[in-house]
Amino acid sequence: MHLDLFSGKSITVHGQDGSVYTPEVSAATVRALIAVAAFAGLRHGEIRGLWWEDDEDDRLTIRRSVWRTQVKDTKTHEDEENPGVVPIIRPLRVLLDAIRPANAYGWIFPNSVGGALDLANITERVIKPVFKVHGLDWKGWQAYRRGLATNLKKLGVPDTTIQAILRHESVSTTQRFYIKTAREDAMDAMKRLEEKLKCAAVVQQKVN
């Protein structure tokens, strides 16, 4: 999940030039960003497009996406009149509440001048360097969305339900996320078989 990489109040970043600095963005904000991606499965632009008015306590309504400085409908054409809806699970609720201001309105993730936070900038200046220090590769915001799909699939959630959570227009789009999962499960199964065969071979040798 990577939330533990940003467990403090502030973040210390080690630059490639040997510099060490503390970015303006708080650790709590980065945790909330990751949680929205991982627990709600929102796309990059949809995360940027969230307003506090979209937070309805037990659900997020998805009305807009932000690309660069442009506010537009989401990839699946959700908007003010026909918003998408994603349940807010307890871990996400806690992390959103941690950054919620007293009079919450406007962007959930604002930048310093009142616009939508630039996730690409945060990724390059903050997240990637922290990942690197811990020996991890950044796979992109989409990886959290795919991870959510994978985890739901492993829990036995029907494809159509996962489709609704990820807000895909077609269930076939959802199912394509499981190609990797199926291969990983197959590899794991074959490794277990390999270990079993090794044990059987050892027993056979002892008998002989």
Language model features with spans:
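C-terminal catalytic core of tyrosine-transesterase DNA break-rejoin enzymes
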Residues: A32-A35, F39-E46, N121-I122, P129, ...
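Short, polar N-cap/turn motifs at the start of nucleic acid-interacting alpha helices
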Residues: E53-T61, W138, V157-R176
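C-terminal secondary-structure termini that scaffold catalytic or DNA-interacting sites
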Residues: F6-Y21, R68-L92, A98, A102-A104, ...
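Catalytic tyrosine of NAD(P)H-dependent dehydrogenase/reductases that use a Tyr as the general acid/base
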Residues: W141-Q142, Y178
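Hydrophobic alpha-helix feature that most strongly marks membrane-spanning transmembrane helices
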Residues: R100-P101, K132, K153-V157, R167-S170, ...
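Basic, Lys/Arg- and aromatic-enriched nucleic-acid-binding interface segment
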Residues: M1-H44, R48-L50, D79-P83, A102, ...
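Residue-level detector of conserved, well-ordered beta-strand and adjacent loop positions
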Residues: L3, R63, I89, P110-N111, ...
